[in-house]
From Swiss-Prot:
Organism phylogeny: Viruses, Riboviria, Orthornavirae, Negarnaviricota, Polyploviricotina
InterPro entries according to UniProt: RNA-dir_pol_NSvirus, RNA_pol_PB1_influenza
Organism: Influenza A virus (strain A/Mallard/New York/6750/1978 H2N2)
Signal peptide: none
GO molecular-function terms, A-Z: nucleotide binding; RNA binding; RNA-directed RNA polymerase activity
Main location: host cell
Subunit structure: Influenza RNA polymerase is composed of three subunits: PB1, PB2 and PA. Interacts (via N-terminus) with PA (via C-terminus). Interacts (via C-terminus) with PB2 (via N-terminus); this interaction is essential for transcription initiation.
Biased composition (Polar residues): 55-64
UniProt EC number: 2.7.7.48
Segments carrying motif Nuclear localization signal: 187-195, 203-216
Protein name: RNA-directed RNA polymerase catalytic subunit
PTM (free text): Phosphorylated by host PRKCA.
Domain RdRp catalytic span(s) in chain numbering: 286-483
Functional summary from the UniProt entry: RNA-dependent RNA polymerase which is responsible for replication and transcription of virus RNA segments. The transcription of viral mRNAs occurs by a unique mechanism called cap-snatching. 5' methylated caps of cellular mRNAs are cleaved after 10-13 nucleotides by PA. In turn, these short capped RNAs are used as primers by PB1 for transcription of viral mRNAs. During virus replication, PB1 initiates RNA synthesis and copy vRNA into complementary RNA (cRNA) which in turn serves as a template for the production of more vRNAs.
């Protein structure tokens, strides 16, 4: 039958139709090749926004630096970074006046965190610039390398395991005249293969010691490596993002802890909460403005967009904010927090891999590394690249560009939100001292501004005043990209508000489907996504049931596990049919083993193995949940795992799902080819690190794990824990006397070995 599509909307309020405007099907664009060009763009743009500032030279590194602060006043319309310190400080003072005690309390909370945080906090996070190897590494490896180098240079405060002590080492390292590091390098040589008699290239990995003088070390410590941001929809041009090294990370973490604590106490802040909590918080602000404006006032809302938020922020402003926020605190605390902005004022941007050239005629390819851009002949480059390089040359030192102004993406989200909220806070009537007043929402660089006034002129005046106040602290509201509406309809951080936040279900569409981790995780993630959308995104029962059926179909096609009684022929159908025939209770077979689907919208919260356990044949149970099965490389699975799901817009979200370990929870093996490259030494370090951590977690399962207080090494902690556990097990009769004696003996041996070492 033909359906007239307009009939679908007869009963639907207009705002709920937003899901039908979904433009993002298909894969998002990814970047290929080098990010050098994008990084040069960022550096050049940032300097352009602050070009009227003062130039100085860093005495330690010789880097030229531009300081736009307290220089010329900003102009209308043109984005700029000319923030005025006294304006920022005044905004902070008013913020504190309207929220008595907010800074004091946040400082106390942060101080506690600073004293308790362990250095392993820095192992969280993905790619990190590893200054010892001058390239990106997984965070845990980069930290291990840094600590190893510190210790070999006589910096040992970090051995206490507290982050603050590691940071003491960082500070000391910057005063050293030289640092000795170990770098990996590879030798290639041509040898004849005995079997095939062909010439092959053999690679061997070496480690060599290298000394860095103070200047070279400082440059590396202040370097942010850059990459291209992937999977950004709705943009024609890619852009660069930064990954800081281990020296900067710890300091940034503490500053963000303080700022997060402040944001939690500010009703206008969209961070650090998310999801429904965020919607509730924001709806309150809107409700407040609408209730006050009902009788006499007009109320308008701007869906705001700021021009180049990061590139116009300035670390010097953040230093001023921190100095003010912590003004009554102990000296050591103020020092720890002011280091991050100081390092950012002196930061260097690494230009990435450089450029690739190829000659079609001679079939040659050659890489021009970023280090060579300072003095290579520019005739090889096209017009636009030539301009970029010419512009950036005065700033280059050792393949990195001096970048004093600007913040780089994603570094101080919380602190910059505090700055934004402080301007929203100035909109109260007692501060504007006139008929208009404003309030709003801020989340990093995204904002919504609600202005109330008795007439349109008042609204216009209010918007103008807000715009100019922002300018004074380096925030540039874009007049072109912001739009104004009667209050009640606006968008903020991809939430659409229309008399309440509208569920935009289509945003979640890309996360429906089979993730491709393994049969067990994929089934669990798939049903959890549907469950979560029923809870949070108005996914109705009928649609959910349909989504579930489509998911099961998709899953069966992905893993070629159609039901045992199907006619579809795949590579697996022969085995699955055989299993089907010899199984007594066919309902007990998992979908991935050709079984039927028992999920419906009522039982999505139950893992499939649990759902079918009572229905399974006994021998099938034994095969399915058999940790000794030799064909499965077994992941130890906690009861809850985390999956990364991609909404259409905004950052990848982490989603918890129930994980039951079965023989379907396999992990694909690591590609072997890595073992022949210079990564090999690093891979071995990483595996060792992993093994140690896994072992430690065996001794301290997360439920009983209290952060170790006092100073003891991992080994000492594990030995003492083993002794305690053994005694308890022995006294309760769980282990025999001989076993107890053996455990004690092993513990003593370990301690003896440590003493000898």
């Amino acid at each position: 039958m033909d359906v007239n599509p307009t009939l679908l909307f007869l009963k639907v309020p207009a705002q709920n139709a937003i899901s039908t405007t979904f433009p993002y099907t298909g894969d998002p664009p990814y970047s290929h090749g080098t990010g050098t060009g994008y990084t040069m763009d960022t550096v050049n743009r940032t300097h352009q926004y602050s070009e009227k500032g003062k130039w100085t030279t860093n005495t330690e590194t010789g880097a030229p630096q531009l300081n736009p602060i307290d220089g010329p006043l900003p102009e209308d319309n043109e984005p700029s970074g000319y923030a005025q310190t006294d304006c920022v400080l005044e905004a902070m003072a008013f913020l504190e006046e309207s929220h008595p005690g907010i800074f004091e309390n946040s400082c106390l909370e942060t101080m506690e965190v600073v004293q308790q945080t362990r250095v392993d906090k820095l192992t969280q996070g993905r790619q990190t610039y590893d200054w010892t190897l001058n390239r990106n590494q997984p965070a845990a490896t980069a930290l291990a390398n840094t600590i190893e180098v510190f210790r070999s240079n006589g910096l040992t405060a970090n051995e206490s395991g507290r982050l603050i002590d590691f940071l003491k080492d960082v500070m000391e390292s910057m005063d050293k005249e030289e640092m000795e590091i170990t770098t990996h390098f590879q030798r290639k040589r041509r040898v004849r293969d005995n079997m095939t008699k062909k010439m092959v290239t053999q690679r061997t990995i070496g480690k060599k010691k290298q000394r860095l003088n103070k200047r070279s070390y400082l440059i590396r410590a202040l370097t942010l490596n850059t990459m291209t941001k992937d999977a950004e929809r709705g943009k024609l041009k890619r852009r660069a993002i930064a990954t800081p090294g281990m020296q900067i990370r710890g300091f940034v973490y503490f500053v963000e802890t303080l700022a997060r604590s402040i944001c939690e106490k500010l009703e206008q802040s969209g961070l650090p909460v998310g999801g429904n909590e965020k919607k509730a918080k924001l709806a309150n602000v809107v409700r407040k403005m609408m209730t006050n404006s009902q009788d006499t006032e007009l109320s308008f809302t701007i869906t705001g967009d700021n021009t180049k938020w990061n590139e116009n922020q300035n670390p010097r402003m953040f230093l001023a904010m921190i100095t003010y926020i912590t003004r009554n605190q102990p000296e050591w605390f103020r020092n720890v927090l002011s280091i991050a902005p100081i390092m950012f004022s002196n930061k260097m941007a690494r230009l990435g891999k450089g450029y690739m050239f190829e000659s079609k005629s001679m079939k040659l390819r050659t890489q021009i590394p970023a280090e060579m851009l300072a003095d290579i002949d520019l005739k090889y480059f096209n017009e636009s690249t030539r301009k970029k390089i010419e512009k950036i040359r005065p700033l280059l030192i050792d393949g990195t560009a001096s970048l004093s102004p600007g913040m780089m993406m994603g570094m101080f989200n919380m602190l910059s939100t505090v700055l934004g909220v402080s301007i929203l806070n100035l909109g109260q009537k007692r501060y504007t001292k006139t008929t208009y007043w404003w309030d709003g929402l801020q989340s990093s660089d995204d904002f919504a501004l609600i202005v109330n006034a008795p007439n349109h002129e008042g609204i216009q005046a209010g918007v103008d005043r807000f715009y100019r106040t922002c300018k004074l602290v380096g925030i540039n509201m874009s007049k072109k990209k912001s739009y104004i509406n009667r209050t009640g309809t606006f968008e903020f951080t991809s939430f659409f508000y229309r008399y309440g936040f509208v569920a935009n279900f289509s945003m979640e569409l890309p996360s429906f489907g089979v993730s491709g981790i393994n049969e067990s995780a994929d089934m669990s993630i798939g049903v959890t996504v549907i469950k979560n959308n029923m809870i949070n995104n108005d996914l109705g029962p009928a649609t959910a049931q349909m989504a579930l059926q489509l998911f099961i179909k998709d899953y069966r096609y992905t893993y070629r596990c159609h039901r045992g009684d199907t006619q579809i022929q795949t590579r697996r159908s022969f085995e699955l049919k055989k299993l089907w025939e010899q199984t007594r209770s066919k309902a007990g077979l998992l979908v991935s083993d050709g079984g039927p689907n028992l999920y419906n919208i009522r039982n999505l919260h139950i893992p499939e193995v649990c759902l079918k356990w009572e229905l399974m044949d006994e021998d099938y149970q034994g095969r399915l949940c058999n940790p000794l099965n030799p064909f499965v490389s077994h992941k130890e699975i906690e009861s809850v795992n985390n999956a990364v799901v991609m909404p259409a817009h905004g950052p990848a979200k982490s989603m918890e799902y129930d994980a039951v370990a079965t023989t379907h929870s396999w992990i694909p093996k690591r590609n072997r080819s890595i073992l022949n490259t210079s990564q090999r030494g690093i891979l071995e370090d990483e595996q060792m690190y992993q093994k140690c951590c896994n072992l430690f977690e065996k001794f301290f399962p997360s439920s009983s794990y209290r952060r170790p207080v006092g100073i003891s090494s991992m080994v000492e902690a594990m030995v003492s824990r083993a002794r305690i556990d053994a005694r308890i097990d022995f006294e309760s009769g769980r282990i025999k006397k001989e076993e107890f004696a053996e455990i004690m003996k092993i513990c003593s041996t370990i301690e003896e070995l440590r003493r000898q070492k």
